[in-house]
Amino acid sequence: HSLQFDFREIESIANWLRRATIDTCIFNLETSYDNSTDKKKAFLHVFFFFFNGKRGFNKFNITMAQHLEKPLADKGVFEAFKKRIAEEGGDWNDPGMAADMIDNELSLVLDIAAELAPSLDKESIRERIIKRDTNMSIERFGGELAAYLKDKGDDYRLILLADEVSQFINKERD
């Protein structure tokens, strides 16, 4: 194949790049994979981990991101939630501390969430977090990705770059 470009095409691309917003998530699939995850869902889990991190959610606890953080964000109170957690001595932006609070102070966390978003069903969220009910599917990931991108505009791109894919596949095939 012979690729030919004229100056106007290159100039158009350069102009788009100047106004574009491009976010990247770069990760190594083999080192990001949680061995306790069903191997058939490994790719989905890792992509969800990093996508949740890009959205400002906990990237290590998909259940917490899906059932607590995302509903708070959808209601516009996620930042207020993090401030209230800080008032209680926690740092929700630290994934380890957030996980510790979920493990050790779940009632407090859910009380704060319900205080800011009274329509949340604390008991349903509690049950899902305890059971690690992730309700993961490619359709759900695609829907959440589409919703995230919807408000970003035509000049936004999110690039997910996964390294070591072939090594992971070959290792898991054995």
Predicted segments — roles?
Residues 6, 60-159:
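Mid-core helix/loop region of P-loop NTP-binding domains shared across ATPases and GTPases
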Residues 28, 149-172:
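Conserved P-loop NTPase "ATPase switch" module shared by AAA+ and STAND
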Residues 1-100:
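P-loop NTPase motor core
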Residues 33-36, 119-120, 166-170:
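Flexible loop/turn segments at secondary-structure boundaries
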Residues 1, 131-134, 146, 166-167, ...:
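Signature of the SF2 helicase/ATPase Hel1-core->accessory helical subdomain module
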